C-alpha cells in the first residue's frame, strides 16, 4: 500500500498517466471524424502524449541543473569559509610572531635581538602588508642612542675601512653587529628601484647612528636622515626616492670613520633637503636627478664634490654652502631658480663651473661663486 501511495505521488507516474489520458482523449476525438484513419488518430495521440513526456524530461533536467548549482554554491561558500578561517589563523599567527619579536628586541642578549629581527623580516616576507610596520620597527631600533669608540676618536678622517686598531667595549661591538643586521634587513625588504609595481616604503632614521648604510638600487618612499650620524660610507646610488628626502644636519663631524657619500644616478622625485649636512669625505652626486626643490643651504663639503651631469628641474639653493675640495658643478640641466650667497670654495683646488658662473676672490684667500 505504501509503495502504491509513493507511486501515485510520483511526478513520473502522473506524467505517464497524463500522457496516456491525452493519447486516449486525442485518439478518441479524432476517431469520431470519418475522414481520419485509425493509424493517423493513434499517431496524433501518441505525439500529444509524447509531448507531455518531453516536457516532463525538460522540467526534470532543469530541476537537476538547479540542484547542482545549489550544491556548487554551498560548496563554494564552504570553501570560502575555510579560506577565511585559514586566513584568520595566518593573521593570528603573524600577529603573535610580530608581537613576540618586538618584545624580544628588548632582550639583553644580542643573539636574541638578531633572531627577533630576522623573525620580523620573515613576517614581512610572508605578509607583505606588514612590511612598512616592520621597517618602522627596524628604523626605530637604529634610532636608539648608540656610540662607539671609533666615532669619538679625534684626528683626521682616513680610510673609512681602517679602524686604526680602535675597538669598542664588548657591549659596543656586539650592539654594532645587531645594528648592522638591522640595516641589512632594511635593504632586503626594500623593492628594487626599477620595480614599477612595488610600493615605496618610508624610512625614518632621524638621529640614527648608521655605518656602511647601503641603500643603492632601491625604491624608497619618504626618507628621513635628519641629524643622523653617517659613519664609514653611505651609498644611495641608483635609488629612486618617491617622497621627500631630508638629510638636514646629517653627517659625521667626529671620529675616524668619516666616509664617502655616494648618490650617483639617484632620482629624487620630490624635494631633497641637505641643509646643514656635513660631507666629511667625497660626495658623489654625478648623474643624479632632482625633480623637486633642492637645498644645500649651510652644507659643508669637506672633501671633493662631484655634481657633474646633475639634472635640476626645479630650484637650487647653495646659500652659504662651503666646498673644501675639488668641485664640479657642470650640471646637465641647470635649475630654474638659483640661490648663491657666500658659496665658498678653495681656489687652490680644481673648480669646474657652468659658463655663466665665476669665482670672486676674497681677502682671506678664499673665493666665492657668483653669477657672471
What does each model-identified segment do?
Residues 1-2:
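Short, Lys/Arg-rich, polar N-terminal cytosolic tail immediately upstream
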Residues 5-6:
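Transmembrane alpha-helix/interfacial motif
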Residues 9-96, 103:
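Membrane-embedded hydrophobic alpha-helical segments
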Residues 75, 84-87, 96-104, 108-121, ...:
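N-terminal leader/targeting and pre-domain segments
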